[in-house]
Amino acid sequence: QHSKLYMESLEGFDFANETNSLYIAAVEFAQAAREYPIVFGKDPQDVVFPVALLGLRPNQNLYVDKEGKWNASYIPAYARRYPFILAKGGAEEEQFTVCIDEGYKGFNTAKEGQALFDKKGEQTDVLNQAVDFLKDYQNHVQLTTLFCANLAELDLLEPMTANIEMTSGEKLSIGGFQCVSREKLKALKPGKLAD
């Protein structure tokens, strides 16, 4: 289906301009925490996951400007993988399918940019690089899931609400997330912390 597809690398993160939080892998914490608050959410199955907060309101990303430029030194891998994503698929639980956002403006059949497949139908370097990035990203997601499960098991997370007063005087309250309790972390036995 996509054998004749070409991709132009377009600068810009317009696709994320209304995204107020993004998944962040544990391996990214050190770099991401310099620019974004990192908090934890829970899915309907009570699985804990980390996110970088990008906005104070729904559909607000304070890091993407009107031209689609990301105004931060570090861009989360979740955004950098676009327009490619992995979707669970197949009989195996750990089997994933590489998917694309067909609405991405850089995709075309006019042979502009780089082909995703060569004349023999094999993946080109550009697609191989995207697939390698996705595989690496998914490995980090799995490690992050284990890390977050440990945080929950050690009861280190607590609900938090952030109360913010804007320079205009407007007051905002952001809740529905968790953070690591400093008191519980300090009280943790050294052996448990090493786990």
Task: Annotate each predicted stretch with a short phrase.
Residues F49-F117:
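Aromatic- and glycine-enriched beta-alpha-beta binding-site module
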Residues A33-E35, Y74, R81, P159:
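Short beta-strand-initiation
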Residues D43-Q45, A79, C179:
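Short, glycine-/Ser/Thr-/acidic-enriched flexible segments
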Residues D14-E18, N59-L62, E67, H140-L146:
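Short, basic/low-complexity N-terminal boundary segments at the transition from targeting/disordered tails
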Residues A26-Q31, I75-A77, L151-L156:
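Short linear motifs in intrinsically disordered
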Residues Q1-L54:
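Short, extreme N-terminal leader segments that mark the start of a protein/domain
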Residues L86, A91-D195:
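A contiguous, surface-oriented mixed alpha/beta subdomain in the mid-to-C-terminal portion of proteins
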Residues Q45-V47, G68, G169:
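Detector for glycine-centered tight turns/loop "hinges" at secondary-structure junctions
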